[in-house]
Amino acid sequence: MAEIRSLAGSMLPLARMEKVIIVGSGCAGLTAAIYAARANLSPLVLEGRQPGGQLSTTTMVENFPGFPEGIDGPQLILNMHQQAEKFGARFSYSEATDLDMAGDRLRLRADDEWLETQALIIASGASARYLGLENEEKLIGHGLTSCATCDGAFYRNVPVCVVGGGDSAAEEALFLTRFASKVYLIHRRDQLRASKIMADRVLSAQKIEPIWNTIVTRYIPDDKGEMSAVEMRNVATKEVKILPVACVFVAIGHDPNTKAFAGKLETDPEGYLLVRHLAESKHPGIFIAGDVADRVYKQAVTAAGSGCAAAIEAEKYLSGL
């Protein structure tokens, strides 16, 4: 049987019927947990195998309100976790793997056990796509990132590169011109896939230098484990070069973490869960928060706000049962 853990290390069996189950423990899930717990709903948070969401791999967060000096991502997550637990939220490392919406009850599979819940908040997030190269996990937060808005300001007056060729890559590159001394845009094709207006802006930006028909084949860290350069290969000529950069911004998309809900809930063409009104899904009792439904902003503060909305809407729903 799966277990509920507390920060104190105690273990309890999972209840078979819950008022609220929250899937995910990033900013959205933990904010939902805080609000649901303060409403005396005793939410059960399924953290899964990688608790904390994307912030757990972020070093310094400077744009979350209330921290004028910034705060480490893992510390922010720990603070939110402790706050939720203080009000009565419970946590499990169990991972949601399936959803059954037949009948008048919601049934969620957590590892090897089926749980029933009156309300379900899905805040399972989205995972940035990376290149799958050696040392990738170690370098995330140390000169490798997928968010220029989050990390661009850390790289003032140094060269950086963006990997990708769509609108997201174009937006990242343009944003980084505010800080970096040079922005290399590495794309495996000979022209951008971005919309014409975005492509024109990139190609006319003085600080941006496109590198066409090229892929990154290796990250090169310095002796402190920080990014110092990338190895690139031209896909046409096979020529290999080393490009010194302080940070690599990978902008090749995100994958919403919706495997457990595939074919069960409405999604857009990219797989993001659809929200009908505020945080509500099409199915009664199921609410959605955070990056699993956000294909645009993907910020900690917007995730937290949607987590708040999901918990409040879940409380309203439960009060009407």
Give the ranges of each region predicted by the language model.
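FAD-site-proximal beta/loop scaffold in flavoenzymes
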Residues: 132, 138-154, 251-302, 306, ...
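Extreme N-terminal leader/targeting segments of oxidoreductases
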Residues: 1-20, 78
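Glycine-rich dinucleotide-binding loop and its adjacent helix/turn
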Residues: 4, 126-179, 274-276
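A Rossmann-like FAD-binding core segment of flavoenzymes
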Residues: 84-103, 107-110, 114-115, 178-276, ...
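Phosphate-coordination loops involved in phosphoryl transfer and adenosine-cofactor binding
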Residues: 17-19, 93-94, 156-158, 213, ...
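Conserved phosphate-binding and hydrolysis motifs of nucleotide-dependent enzymes
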Residues: 24-29, 125, 164-166, 290
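Beta1-alpha1 glycine-rich phosphate/pyrophosphate-binding loop at the start
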Residues: 18-87, 158, 168-196, 268
